[in-house]
Amino acid sequence: MDLGIAGKWALVCGASKGLGFGCAQALVREGVNVVINARNADVLAQAAAKLIAASAEYASARGQKDSQPAVVAVAADITTPEGRAAVFAAAGGPGRDFDIVVTNAGGPPPGDFRDWDRDAWIKAVDANMLTPIELIKATVDGMAARGFGRVINITSSAVKAPIDVLGLSNGARSGLTGFVAGVARSKIASQGVTINNLLPGKFDTDRLATTVRAASEKSGKSVEEIRRTQ
């Protein structure tokens, strides 16, 4: 399948593993140049090596060995102004001129709402609502000016079917959903820019394992029992 996006530039957050890595890999296989971001430099470097190999395969299959998709890795905390600045200033990257942005911040810890203080809520909202908004704000006008842009926010199916132990995530991601619904319907829609949320269900990632353990501790059921009911 040719999606017609070869040569575009994409920013993929949380790309060292899991769904973020899967998105980056799929984009590279379509000939897209990627800037990948995560906090753990070692794990991100391993992901970059795999993506570079996929990039070489893409170029080789098309007889373009000297012109393969770029893979730029930036180890930084994207939830901070400094982290976002590092991504936009990355050597070999496009600056803020991304054609595709995949926001994918790690979810806040599961637990009981009675135990969450104001700081816990602020951290959740900052990472899972405000950070994607800041990335959209930094890139969307450039997309509109060029007549093409795609923003994908990886949130959670819990936005539509809330899970009690994921209250921090439910709240923050629902706020992002409301914001995106308005912006996606604004003038940019007629300028070739789309903004969508991806609400993944259950994938066997580290995040799911953490959620299952939390549900096990709260219910008194074994991890195996919880997994069987997923």
Each PLM stretch: what is its role?
Residues 32-47:
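Conserved glycine-rich Rossmann-like NAD(P)H-binding loop of the short-chain dehydrogenase/reductase
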Residues 150-175, 180-189, 201-203:
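Catalytic loop of short-chain dehydrogenase/reductase
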Residues 112-114, 120-125, 151:
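Substrate-binding pocket helix/loop in short-chain dehydrogenase/reductase
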Residues 136-137, 181:
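A short, exposed helix-loop element centered on a Lys and neighboring polar residues
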